[in-house]
Amino acid sequence: MHGISRREALAGAAAGIGLAPRAARAAQASSAVTVGMIGTGSRGRFDGILFAQDGRARIVALCDIVPEQIENTRSAIPSTAKARAYKDYRELLADPSIDAVLIATPVFLHPEHFEAAVKAHKHIYIEKPAGADVAGVKRLLEAARQADKARHIVFGFQNRYSPEYNTAEEIVRTGKLGELLMMECHFIKGGAPIRPLDYPPEERLRHWGAWRDMSGDFIVEQDCHGLDILNWFAKAHPLKAIGSGGRIKRSYGDNFDHLSVTYEYPGGLRGMLVATQLTPPRYRDVREQFFGTRGVLETHRQYYKWDRGEGPIVKVDSKREITIDAVEIFLNKVLAGKPENTAFSACESTFTSILGRMAMDARRELTWEEMLRS
């Protein structure tokens, strides 16, 4: 069976609740969590900087198939100057002195690298999503079910660790928004055009984000963030989806550059995704909206906004970059010996993205069960 039970999914969904106090930072250097980085590209470096800045983590190993990426990471994170360098992730995982791994590799490699990290009994912080296709996510899901229950497993769905997102979820969960009628997520974000590198065959791997078989398309690689929030707030995954998308401007790779998908959740609740990469690089509209009988709630990495229909609109700004919260809570859990396995909700959110992509390709309504059988 490759589906996800509600108990598994809800266990993962609870990981962002009951956030450990930020005052827990003061740990002895000797008790620092030793971390190995698998994948040292731009996202890996971003996460690695936050681990290094926390003070309770020590990055002791770096792994990448591109040597210059390791050198770029040493420059960005001076404390890694003497970190051991690997080209083969299996050699890094074989090191018993490494407590945890930070995995930030191309999406299609996530199942393979996650499975190996589970077998090596490491704590795992792995970037989202859980895979690029149904088979890959099923592979990762099966590995998650075999994971050591003493090891903490977290995916890069960092919105779940933001205090502001948790407050917004509580507003919906406790009925303060009334009956939830509809949900929307927007992922409207441009970027510079991708130009092929000068050295094939490495070129395609270096630009993995442009290719469906490597990234899952941008509905999987990027839009999974918003869909993860819809699933979290709805306390369910969608039953079916219908949508359309295509390529207007993109000339490289085979991913879409715009799309729109409508998901149907239990009880007739609908969730809508609108996404495009056709905007100028500086333009960004990434947020979620929840429409209830008692108001409208908008969530964003930098705030939540609550219109209760009367009186002033409540707007609460985020205090800091929310990935800091995700890294801090990961280390809190590891050091406190209170592990959780969030792979199940991560797989559910990834499957939700894949369902939308498959519905667009099929040009018809597609059910959750059809997606899982593919």
Set out the residue ranges of the language-model regions.
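N-terminal secretory signal peptides and thylakoid transit peptides that target proteins
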Residues: 1-15
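Conserved SAM-binding strand-loop segment of SAM-dependent methyltransferases
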Residues: 83-88
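NAD(P)-dinucleotide binding in Rossmann-like oxidoreductases
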Residues: 251, 255, 264-325
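Glycine- and charged-residue-rich phosphate/anionic-cofactor binding loop of Rossmann-like
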Residues: 58-59, 312-316, 333-349
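Beta-strand-loop-alpha-helix segment that lines the small-molecule cofactor/substrate pocket
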Residues: 106-107, 111-161, 175, 363
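N-terminal Rossmann-like dinucleotide-binding module
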Residues: 12-78, 230
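Predominantly a Rossmann-like dinucleotide-binding segment in NAD(P)-dependent oxidoreductases
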Residues: 39, 146-154, 158-253, 261-263, ...
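N-terminal Rossmann-like NAD(P) cofactor-binding module of classical short-chain dehydrogenase/reductase
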Residues: 101-102
